[in-house]
Amino acid sequence: MSGPRPVRAPRGTELSALGWQQEAALRMLQNNLDPEVAEHPDKLVVYGGTGKAARDWRSFDAMVRTLRTLKQDETMLVQSGRPVGVMQTHEWAPRVLIANSNLVGDWANWEEFRRLEALGLTMYGQMTAGSWIYIGTQGILQGTYETFAAVAAKKFNGTLAGTITLTAGLGGMGGAQPLAVTMNDGVAICIDVDPRAIERRIEHRYLDVKADSLEHALQLAVEARDARRPLSIGLLGNAAELLPRMLAEGAPVDIVTDQTSAHDPLAYLPVGVDFDDMAAYAAKDPAGFTTRARESMARHVEAMVGFMDAGAEVFDYGNSIRGEAQLAGYERAFAFPGFVPAYIRPLFCEGKGPFRWAALSGEASDIAKTDKALLELFPENESLHRWIKMAGERVHFQGLPARICWLGYGERDKAGERFNDMVASGELQAPLAIGRDHLDCGSVASPYRETEAMLDGSDAIADWPLLNAMVNVASGASWVSIHHGGGVGMGRSIHAGQVSVADGTELAGEKIRRVLTNDPGMGVIRHVDAGYDIAESVADERGVRVPMREGDDA
């Protein structure tokens, strides 16, 4: 009988499918549900509150069975975590096409989604949960690290040493925050309502210590700050209660952000509700729970604004908490900016974003070899060298060994081709799955996050992620996905992802060159179209064709 059981991706070179493209999809699906990787694997939940890899266990079993028999000229179709068909295509076509959580506009809200989910008709795919390229907390770590580095450069003379950051949320995404802060030499107080989340981050070496109380957390933080010693501190509690208290007591906080699961009100614990009662209350009275959660978020955001008024650097880290607080009636919810317009958009203009790869061999040595190859490929890229060195020393692998680093247009293709050559030569023990987060330069429409405050006002234009997905299908990606609602919740985002398998063949090399050129190229084009000078310069320098800038009237 199909049901919950431990899942772990196979390692080594023995195939259980008919080719490495299919084998890679199979292993990455299984890896998403590895207990080392997934937050709640028995429920098929990978990260992000309720982000799932498969709709139900019967669907999971059907996908595994189908991938093992899928031919080199066939494509499996996945509709919100359930395999619904196999079509004959061709060897350049993706082996899997995925559409998760997509709803027509007027129906794109949590209430309707949950009604359909209860009927067994859909699932929430988040971003990399339902697209089978989640690699654990490392997947967001460099982006979080770069964000805090940008904060340091903007306000603290290039370092967070001697500063205290206050944040909440230590789940699969938020769990990157403590290590990202300490990598920038700062001190972090990280609040979470779930004791298991705190222990998991300590176990995975993302979080240093757990405080016994708020007073203990502040004592540890001030001592470390005064010594200019990096330290991350986990604190059990509800941010909607603790932040207002800390503000009222004048806590010495320099930076404030948040990564609770505010994108889904049923995943945010209301003030006055015990954590152990949360799931039952949310299931019994979702409307009442949502109202109370939003009221609590309003208190949380009001305190964040209070810290900003007191001089702290405050930003939204893309979980929709400002929008939820506004729905609860808090008028100053958008007084502080999102992290993309504040710090990250110049990188997007260059086609930069979270490039990642996983070693299907299961051998950490394969990642070490790819790290070395990257440093040789890009000897002038100081930030890349700094990141790879720190990641090699401090990042704990979850599931299949993997690495993430931010690379731009003209870099990702070089890295992918080099990796494919390493597989072909036998330098690597098995192929690599090369993908990215959906949070990328040209693959998202999300007015509360990636496309907030676009120069031309095109925040909500959703053509771009659809074009991105189609370009990746046309370019030869191994699997391609289009999702709705990731990161910020239902009705607030459309986004696309791709994974390409470096199996050492000449065909894989051709596909990789096209995909890893065109995928980040969409980011350059999207930002040229929005009027960003940096993107125009990148397009001119690197030969990205933009028809509206060609011809006599360009």
Swiss-Prot record:
It is an enzyme of class 4 (lyase). Binds 1 NAD(+) per subunit. InterPro entries: Urocanase, Urocanase-like, Urocanase_C, Urocanase_central_sf, Urocanase_CS, Urocanase_N, Urocanase_Rossmann-like, Urocanase_sf. Transmembrane segments: none annotated. Its main location: cytoplasm. It catalyses: 4-imidazolone-5-propanoate = trans-urocanate + H2O. Its cofactor is NAD(+). PROSITE patterns: UROCANASE. GO terms for cellular component: cytoplasm. Its EC number is 4.2.1.49. Pathway: Amino-acid degradation; L-histidine degradation into L-glutamate; N-formimidoyl-L-glutamate from L-histidine: step 2/3. NAD(+) binds at residues 48-49, 126, 172-174, 192, 238-239, 259-263, 268-269, 317, 487. Pfam families: Urocanase, Urocanase_C, Urocanase_N. Keywords: Cytoplasm, Histidine metabolism, Lyase, NAD. It is found in: Cytoplasm. The active site is at C405. GO terms for molecular function: urocanate hydratase activity. Belongs to the urocanase family. Catalyzes the conversion of urocanate to 4-imidazolone-5-propionate. PANTHER family: UROCANATE HYDRATASE (PTHR12216:SF4). This is Urocanate hydratase. It comes from Streptomyces avermitilis (strain ATCC 31267 / DSM 46492 / JCM 5070 / NBRC 14893 / NCIMB 12804 / NRRL 8165 / MA-4680).
